[in-house]
Design a protein with these regions (language model features):
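A beta-rich soluble binding module of mature secreted/lumenal proteins
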Residues: 2-191
Length: 191
């Protein structure tokens, strides 16, 4: 038990230093998008807001999903870094259980780590998507959340609706940060 406390405390310090959303307690069991249809979900999504993460340090974030095989979606995440370079990572998202197709596990080609949860809580497929992920680490949980749009902007009404869903799930939307999607600033992403 003492070893678990030391590991948990060490993890807490590391994650706090890297701006991860580490919270006390186990991951909640949240409802996901009913009748999720991955064929309608594929395509390009713009990141509007996110919980800060160690692995996303840029702006102009996009996620492009493509069909690979039944239950598997190709993933291409891109972002513009402060130095003007474009950072990207390639992976795949797999449906964890066929009975819950909105619960996917994402793994990336260049990262030797276990797959991470990617749960679609809400999406109309045409304008918005709300994604949540959570992993348990002993006494703590590590949370991720993204508000995505098919366009670089999102209406205030839709944004508030997505934030309300997160709030009802126990995720503080005030901890989220906006992603710069300014057309001029993000122009290098279109080259």
């Amino acid at each position: 038990m003492k070893a678990m406390q030391v590991i948990s405390l060490t993890l807490l310090c590391v994650m706090a230093a890297s701006a991860q959303m580490l919270r006390f307690g186990k991951c909640p069991k949240l409802p996901v998008q009913a009748n999720f249809d991955s064929s309608r979900y594929v395509g390009k999504w713009y990141e509007i807001m996110k919980l800060p993460t160690q692995f996303q340090k840029g702006e102009c974030g996009t996620a492009t999903y493509s069909p690979k095989s039944p239950g598997v979606i190709g993933v291409l995440n891109r972002e513009l870094l402060k130095d003007g370079s474009i950072n990207f990572i390639v992976g795949s998202a797999k449906v964890k259980h066929p009975s819950e197709p909105a619960k996917l596990e994402v793994s990336f080609t260049d990262i030797p780590s276990p797959p991470g949860p990617y749960w679609v809580l809400s999406s109309d497929y045409e304008t918005h998507s709300l994604v949540y992920g959570c992993s348990d680490f002993g006494l703590f949980r590590l949370e991720f959340a993204w508000i995505l749009s098919r366009e670089p902007t999102m209406s205030e009404e839709t944004l508030q609706s997505m934030q309300s869903i997160l709030s009802a799930a126990g995720v503080n939307p005030e901890k989220m940060v906006a992603t710069n999607q300014d057309e001029t600033y993000c122009a290098p992403m279109n080259q």
